[in-house]
């Protein structure tokens, strides 16, 4: 039981802190959207509504945003995974 408690505490300490994207959906502080990217249309909608970007592309089931709005603060560079605003 003690090992389980330590493991949970460690996971919480490492990075399960949640923030919110523009649409209020929780996001991880490690910059990954909590969505699966089935196609480019879904990715482009996600980029527009979460990162303020005008374009997006699915790559290896992950959504990447491009042309991010200049006033959007990102934890990475344009062309990285969305939900970083």
Curated annotation (Swiss-Prot):
InterPro entries for the chain: LCN-type_CS_alpha_beta_dom, Scorpion_toxin-like_sf
Compartments reported by the entry: Secreted
Domain LCN-type CS-alpha/beta: 22-84
S-S bridge residues: 33-83, 37-58, 43-63, 47-65
Entry's Gene Ontology cellular component terms: extracellular region
SUPFAM superfamilies, alphabetized: Scorpion toxin-like (SSF57095)
Main localisation: secreted
Gene3D superfamilies in alphabetical order: Knottin, scorpion toxin-like
Highest taxon, organism lineage: Eukaryota
Signal peptide annotation: 1-21
Keywords: Disulfide bond, Ion channel impairing toxin, Neurotoxin, Secreted, Signal, Toxin, Voltage-gated sodium channel impairing toxin
Tissues with expression: Expressed by the venom gland.
Gene Ontology molecular-function annotations: ion channel inhibitor activity; sodium channel regulator activity; toxin activity
Function (record text): Alpha toxins bind voltage-independently at site-3 of sodium channels (Nav) and inhibit the inactivation of the activated channels, thereby blocking neuronal transmission. This toxin binds, in vitro, to sodium channels and inhibits the inactivation of the activated channels. Seems not toxic to mice, crickets and sweet-water shrimps.
Domain-level remarks: Has the structural arrangement of an alpha-helix connected to antiparallel beta-sheets by disulfide bonds (CS-alpha/beta).
Family, as annotated: Belongs to the long (4 C-C) scorpion toxin superfamily. Sodium channel inhibitor family. Beta subfamily.
Protein name: Toxin TdNa9
């Amino acid at each position: 039981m003690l090992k389980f408690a330590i493991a949970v505490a460690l996971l919480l300490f490492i990075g399960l802190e949640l923030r919110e994207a523009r649409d209020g959906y929780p996001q991880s502080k490690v910059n990954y959207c909590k969505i699966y990217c089935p196609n480019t249309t879904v990715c482009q909608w996600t980029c527009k509504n979460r990162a303020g970007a005008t374009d997006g592309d699915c790559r290896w089931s992950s959504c990447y945003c491009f042309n991010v709005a200049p006033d959007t603060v990102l934890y990475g560079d344009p062309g990285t995974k969305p939900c970083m605003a």
